[in-house]
Amino acid sequence: MFDKEKRKKSNIIDWIKAILIALILVFLVRTFLFEPYIVQGESMKPTLFNSERLFVNKFVKYTGDFKRGDIVVLNGEEKKTHYVKRLIGLPGDTIEMKNDNLFVNGKRFNEEYLKENKKDAHDSDLNLTGDFGPIKVPKDKYFVMGDNRQNSMDSRNGLGLFNKKDIVGVEELVFFPLDRIRHAK
């Protein structure tokens, strides 16, 4: 009888340990590696759509391995809001938009991800993105834009430039809705 109680108590302790380890692992993964986010709004259309859910790779924040063209999640004011945008300008870059073409440091940058949006705009005799710049991105700042350029608040028009500390991470995978699981590019 004493042996049964001891085994039962030991099993309970083992379960508690397993649950605690699992909770610690979940905390560590969400804090340092991956975290889910919900796309809010149409500013990244047609790349990402309202209410899609994506996993964000937070580890790149620690390595600083951001690349022009990455889709990033950014903290808004006081971390109460989040923005999903495309990273356009890195620290030290000069950004300019002329005749619907993006120029980074004086060289035309191919925005293949805007092909569909540009076609729709040009079919309506419009430019997708109004001319601006040149804008010099200061040290430790980042310039972002939404892919839905005519319907996006971003570094051009209200959000301004972002600090490195404001970048939560880089989009890794769209996981919901299930019929549209993909890596957005």
Curated annotation (Swiss-Prot):
Bilayer topology term: Single-pass type II membrane protein
TM ranges: 15-34
Main location: membrane
GO terms, biological process: signal peptide processing
EC number: 3.4.21.89
Matching Gene3D superfamilies: Umud Fragment, subunit A
Cytoplasmic topology ranges: 1-14
InterPro entries xref list: LexA/Signal_pep-like_sf (IPR036286), Pept_S26A_signal_pept_1 (IPR000223), Pept_S26A_signal_pept_1_CS (IPR019758), Pept_S26A_signal_pept_1_Lys-AS (IPR019757), Pept_S26A_signal_pept_1_Ser-AS (IPR019756), Peptidase_S26 (IPR019533)
Record keywords, A-Z: Cell membrane, Hydrolase, Membrane, Plasmid, Protease, Transmembrane, Transmembrane helix
Family stated for the protein in its record: Belongs to the peptidase S26 family.
Identification of the protein by name: Signal peptidase I P
Active site: 43, 85
GO cellular component labels: plasma membrane
Segments on the Extracellular face: 35-185
Recorded catalytic activity of this chain's protein: Cleavage of hydrophobic, N-terminal signal or leader sequences from secreted and periplasmic proteins
Compartments (UniProt record): Cell membrane
Molecular function terms, GO-annotated: serine-type endopeptidase activity
